From Swiss-Prot:
UniProt key word Cell membrane: no
Protein name, per record: Cell division topological specificity factor
GO biological process, one term: division septum site selection
Entry annotated with the keyword Protein biosynthesis: no
InterPro entries on file: MinE, MinE_sf
This protein's encoding gene: minE
GO cellular component: plasma membrane
Domain of life per record: Bacteria
Keywords: Cell cycle, Cell division
The organism of origin for this protein: Gloeobacter violaceus (strain ATCC 29082 / PCC 7421)
Length: 91
């Protein structure tokens, strides 16, 4: 993608408000291209979290994030979940 190329060219650090804005823009574009309503994305996020907490203890102080990424004509749902450990009953 163009953003990735620019990032490689300028070798920017991935911190700060510019990165947050870029990530939000990517999410908006991906949602727009896949025609998924923001409410649907939020529902997907809640359902993913419901399943994950059945099997893992998560770190509630860390950010749980679900994003859509579009690359080479396909879209992927990416979940970033801060997991502390597997629940003992599933070991």
């Amino acid at each position: 993608m163009v953003f990735d190329l620019l990032e490689r060219l300028f070798n920017r650090n991935k911190t700060g408000s510019a990165t947050v804005a870029k990530d939000r823009l990517k999410m908006v574009l991906a949602v727009d291209r896949t025609e998924i309503a923001p409410q649907t994305i939020e529902q997907i996020r809640k359902e993913i979290l419901d399943v994950i907490v059945r099997y893992f203890e998560i770190d509630e102080n860390e950010k749980f994030d679900v994003t859509l990424e579009r690359e080479r004509g396909s879209t992927a749902i990416i979940a970033n979940v801060p997991i502390r450990r597997i629940r003992p009953e599933h070991i």
